[in-house]
Amino acid sequence: MCFTLKNNTIAKKTKKKYNTFVVLTNVNYKHIKFILKRGNQLQNYVFITDSDSDLPYNIVDERKIEMIYMSYNINGEEFFDDLGRNQAHKKYYDDMRAGSVPRTTALPSNYFVEYFSTFLKEGKDILYLAFSSQLSANIFNVFMAKEELLAKYPDRKIIVVDTLSISYPQAILVIMAHDLYKEGKSIEEVANWVEENKLRSQAWFTVDDLKYLQRGGRISAVSAVVGSLLNIKPIITESKEGKIVSIDKIKGRKKSLHYIAQKVADNLDENVDPHLTIIHADALDDANMLAEKIKELVPNIEKIEFSFIGSVIGAHCGPGTVAACFFGKKRAN
């Protein structure tokens, strides 16, 4: 992108701030500054993620992020996770407690062909920050669609980044990458930043009822029964490979929340904004308890946000799940 400016000092200032080439001439600097601040409108690529990020819909709307809504099924009826816009999270978890059994499936490749085609027809390139390839066949269907579309649109770019994350760790990467997008960074620059930093986005979970992990095949039926009888709460995290792994078992809910708070304290990086967010599956009291313990261990923490775990992720972990998500040190597990 090239803009012309009237004075060398302003030219240098603009080049440094907005990373754009400038030529000296008589142009109103304020007008150029306004145009450059609209970076997302000037970009020749679209910024896309999916609802498995559990990104709150108000942030999606505010940032105008393109969103792929993942699907789930209840009693043969298909729904799409709309991030709580029309489908209340609390009701969803109340229904699960009452016996509702949501099941999730990957979107077919033809869905992505149709979705991406909308932008490719407009001459736009595509950057898609996808949830972890280790948790679904979804990303493989994306790559099938990409191959088909590039044969039809050989002059376009489709960059798919496997974030190796799901739920709010993915959302944190999306928010930070979208800031770069708004600054006018190229599609390659944004994709490379995510690749280089994705293992710094962490989540530490604990579930309330083991039957949901057992139903999803994460633990055996025997382990679920024994664990429930002994009030065992597994500690779950996202691994370096992008898998969901159980790394410890703690007896009692309060102790499990304290364990997570300590993991947060151990893994924060004081040199960056952690975007610390506690997510929960209709367990706000426990989320607040976790927040208070984190503040006790990390007194200088400036802000802790709260958000819901979405429908697709919640189908696997169940009501009562609580997690702390943040951007910090690289994952060790």
Region locations from a protein language model:
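Cationic, amphipathic, low-complexity segments that mediate targeting or membrane/lipid association
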Residues: N8-A11
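Short, Lys/Arg-enriched N-terminal segments with co-localized hydrophobic residues
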Residues: K16-Q41
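Mixed-charge interfacial surface used for oligomerization/domain docking
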Residues: G39, N44, D52-D61, I65-S71, ...
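N-terminal glycine-rich anion-binding loop in soluble enzyme alpha/beta folds
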Residues: V46-A106, Y111
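A short glycine/small-residue-enriched secondary-structure motif
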Residues: N86-Y93, F116, K121, E148
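Glycine-rich phosphate- or other oxyanion-binding loops that anchor nucleotides, phosphorylated ligands
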Residues: R97-Y128, S132-L135, F140-M144, A191
